[in-house]
Amino acid sequence: GFIAIPATLALAILAEPLLVTLFQYGAFGADDRFMAAASLRAYTLGLGAFMLVKVLAPGFYAREDMKTPVRIGVIAMVTNMVLNMLFVFPLMWWFEMGHVGLALATSVAAWLNATLLYRGLHRAGILVLEASAKQWLIKIMASAAVMSVLLLQITPEMVIWTEWLWWERGITIAMLCLAGLAAFLASLWILGGRIDHLKR
């Protein structure tokens, strides 16, 4: 689950380069890319929560408790609907970006879902974070920060991306992903983390 931290940051930073590489040909212009990137970044904020829900929910199923995850899911769904109205209209009114409100509401509701699932397992004494897990989380966050700084420094300006052909964009995206991954793993190694720990 910790891998969601670097994945979230990388996707947020590379949102526009990814979109320009995949879609900005012909009628798909700079404004479309900007709007889509804003929505993608809002969804990205919930990436960790989406992963946690998939990990935490089976903890209830293993105890033959089918009702709690469903009840929590309903709470998250209702919250999502309420947040849609709270986010969409202000963003549409002030920034003409109501679609970002939909994505943001989904991410917030996902975090609520994950938090309630974790609280349920924690109260039941099934899931307790040990000190080693907290230390590991700090190492992951520090390594992800190093990766983010590198990506922000080496990612070309968007005006350059639009001048490239599709294969030039693709190669650059691949190189950026590899560079970010290398920076993350190297930083993690220096801090005492090991790759096999990511499987935990």
Placement of each model-derived feature along the sequence:
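Membrane-embedded alpha-helical bundles of multi-pass transporters/translocases
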Residues: 1-200
